[in-house]
Amino acid sequence: MDGQQLARKPRVLCFHGFRTSGKIFEEQTQVWPEFVREKMDLVFVDAPFPAEGGLEELGVAAELFDPPLYEWFQANKDFSEYRNFDECIAFVEDCMTRIGPFDGLMGFSQGAFLSAALPGMQAEGVALTCVPKIKFVMLISGGKFGGSNFSSPKLAPNAFSSPIECPSLHFLGEKDFGLTNGIELLDSFVDPVVLNHPQGHVVPKLDEKGSETMIKFIEKIQELL
């Protein structure tokens, strides 16, 4: 039996986007070919806080998705202040303790911001101190706290102060309104792997090249397990 047959699937904790849910994120990933998805053990969870506001405040989320909808934390309009971020981190660690262990994280949008910050916070000893080290992250339409457009939550001022050596796969959409945030995030990781696609702020469909990029990244991760 060769090494490829012995390689196990990476177990991945998945963080959905702002005002959606674990179920919705799971459905969004169905656009990926089955041969890509079956390479991983993906575990989808709901964020700890119900989406705030009425239909008008929920906006597009209320139009596109069926409730219940959730969010990981809250911020003011210019992202200079955050609420419930510490509680969010505690919730994540509890999830990883109860239903783990996990090898890595995957996040979309708000979930990608969270996923991107956690390896640095864990290395600093301010988060995820009771669970195994995060071995990799996959970030779809992400960005970084402390970047050009977002301040840092009080718990995470140093999340990106040192280069993050954790292997990372970054999905960058040509039509994504947050593309500059995703590009800025690349500088915080050592040897980031980039998957470019022509779509917007979405979990993208994968062409042959995109599927190949994902498979190669996953196989690289399997060598670390």
Which residue ranges define each predicted feature?
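Short glycine-enriched nucleophile-adjacent loop
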Residues: 112-127
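Serine-hydrolase catalytic machinery in alpha/beta-hydrolase-like enzymes
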Residues: 2-102
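Conserved loop-alpha-helix segment in the C-terminal half of the alpha/beta-hydrolase fold
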Residues: 174-192
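Acidic catalytic loop of the alpha/beta-hydrolase fold
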Residues: 145-147, 172-180, 201-202
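Short beta-strand/loop motif that positions the catalytic acidic residue
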Residues: 163-164, 168-172
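The conserved beta1-alpha1 loop
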Residues: 13-17, 141, 172-173
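Gly/Ala-rich beta-loop-alpha elbow adjacent to hydrolase catalytic centers
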Residues: 103-115
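Catalytic active-site module of serine/aspartate enzymes centered on a nucleophile-bearing elbow/loop
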Residues: 207-225
